[in-house]
């Protein structure tokens, strides 16, 4: 698959080199200095940390097919700021994070400004360092994505209402090269015996993903109101992870996750600097994976079996205000203040919460999180922007047992940033 992808990229480069007649480059660079504070891990707090995001792309048009555009894209994101990341519905703090993404594909304008087709192949490499002494590139949750997506774009009007619709399909092959289950370790196998637990595979997090999605962006005449609606359905089979049944027995059946997501955004733009936005998101996750908890003992009488352990229903609400403040930094120039609030509620269908000692409560697990942020942005020139940002996030859950993940803590960051775009 990698060789085929590389061959296609080289072939397209040769074609564009011979037939190119129009070249449109684009480049973005963002840099931030950040001070993080977390309520749970003093080791990951730093007096000053940084983040750099870069993105570069260009469009090449050919005289062979003037409506066909070749578009390679490269992005690189790095952060040394302590930050929470979700891993399989559990949250961990990471000290460093690096993400590299490459895509190459084409846009074909069947009817310019009305109908367009897009095809992309992509490759992503993600490195995440949990502790300071962990070697970068050897992280347990490092992963690589390879895949492609196809989109059909239509732009049309209905009365005074402008629409842009998209229908697409995305395929992703995700691999965790460093991940190993505990019982795959030879020392552990010798201790427990090879016949007492068949869970000796090492690639239990590797998966494939098939995603179909549709969206509609609507402009309501000259009112400056917009509506963005999107629905997606994702089918994710795991390549090796086996389904757990009663008594902890693993079968040959593989885990399959199914996600249904619906998002609605309603923005209003008063002018170039001011506006408001409302948003709602609904996520339904269904899985055939179960959970068998031995509660740290060898007595089977107190074991707990939970069917469909990862099923949940999630709701997200967003509210954002953009407000232009004239003459705040320089006379005759406007600074934009962005105040944002995000509230999230996750209700698990069958998973029970635990107390601090690890014993199950009679209540199902519920997570309630929120983030509030203030962002000041000022354009020095058309291509150069500076910013200052502060954000506070609070995670709260009735799951109090945190030996395998974080559920209750707060996270604060404050920082200064600068970005250039060409």
Question: How should these model regions be labeled?
Answer:
Residues 25-31, 72-76, 117-121, 165-169, ...:
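Membrane-embedded beta-strand positions of outer-membrane beta-barrel proteins
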Residues 54-64, 98-110, 148-154, 212-218, ...:
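Residues on the lipid-exposed face of transmembrane beta-strands in outer-membrane beta-barrel proteins
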Residues 20-61, 77:
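Short glycine/proline- and aromatic-enriched beta-strand/turn motifs that initiate or cap beta-hairpins
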Residues 408-422:
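Outer-membrane beta-barrel "beta-signal"
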Residues 66-72, 110-118, 156-165, 220-229, ...:
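Repeated loop/turn-to-beta-strand initiation elements of outer-membrane beta-barrel proteins
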Residues 215-241, 257-353:
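Detector for outer-membrane/organellar transmembrane beta-barrel domains
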Residues 29-39, 76-84, 121-129, 144, ...:
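Transmembrane beta-strands of outer-membrane beta-barrel pores
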